[in-house]
């Protein structure tokens, strides 16, 4: 869904930047308005798992600064929205304001979000986003029933 949205906006003349660890499979071409920025995740010997969320936030900061982006539109509350919130905070220390739109797709709420370990991060990421959208009314209801969400969630089916 995110890839198709980006490609459609690019056709209308908007510059679209995909920031992720792998080029989206549906993004089988790049054009003058479509860009892909790879997130390079390095192993950190102290930890068993690479710090993807930190690498993603750092890459978001770099791309926002270099490309002068107007906004970050992220898909999924974790890890993308939480990484975007961290990037926004880092950018604020540099005098850069970047709004965040978070689109909820389902598994970030109904599967990952139900894990008690992640609940506070999901709640924080959603509430700190400037705009929140969901792909269905049922997902909007589930989000409000599972988390203490203070933000309006707009449904875009």
What do these predicted ranges mean?
Residues 1-25, 30-37, 67, 131:
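N-terminal subdomain of nucleotide-sugar transferases
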Residues 91-101, 107-125, 141:
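Nucleotide-sugar donor phosphate/pyrophosphate-binding loop at the beta->alpha transition
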Residues 97-101, 131, 152:
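Proline-centered loop/turn at the N-terminus of a beta-strand
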Residues 128-136:
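A short beta-strand/loop micro-motif in the catalytic core of glycosyltransferases
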Residues 37-39, 156:
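Hydrophobic residues at beta-strand termini and immediately following loops
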Residues 45-72, 81-82, 86, 116-120, ...:
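An amphipathic, basic-hydrophobic alpha-helix
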Residues 140-157:
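Helix-loop-beta element that forms the nucleotide-linked donor phosphate-binding surface
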Residues 24, 79-80, 138-140:
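Alpha-helix capping/helix-boundary segments
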